[in-house]
């Protein structure tokens, strides 16, 4: 999932910090996803999908 998130960051020239500020998802949560310390919760996935204008399924492919 984080790979897809990283692709979207690159495509949109955003940083994880910007996404955190814009969505209210804590940077520590994004960092935990990157390191595989925690699983992505559905509500957060929905927020990210809406933010980037993609479907939830995009992250699950």
Go through each PLM region and give its residues.
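A short, Lys/Arg-rich alpha-helix, primarily the initiator
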Residues: 1-15
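The alpha-helix within a helix-turn-helix
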Residues: 9, 20, 49
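Helix-turn-helix DNA-binding elements, focusing on the entry/boundary residues of the two helices
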Residues: 16, 27, 42-45
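Residues in the helix-turn-helix
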Residues: 18, 29, 58
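Recognition helix of helix-turn-helix/homeodomain-like DNA-binding domains
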Residues: 25-39
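DNA major-groove recognition helix of helix-turn-helix/homeodomain DNA-binding modules
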Residues: 43-58
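Phosphate-coordinating loops and pocket residues in cytosolic domains that bind phosphorylated ligands
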Residues: 61
């Amino acid at each position: 999932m984080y790979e897809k998130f990283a692709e979207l960051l690159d495509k949109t020239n955003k940083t994880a910090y910007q996404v955190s500020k814009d969505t209210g998802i804590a940077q520590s949560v994004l960092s935990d996803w990157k390191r595989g310390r925690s699983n992505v919760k559905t509500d957060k996935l929905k927020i990210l999908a809406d933010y980037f204008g993609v479907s939830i399924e995009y992250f699950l492919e």
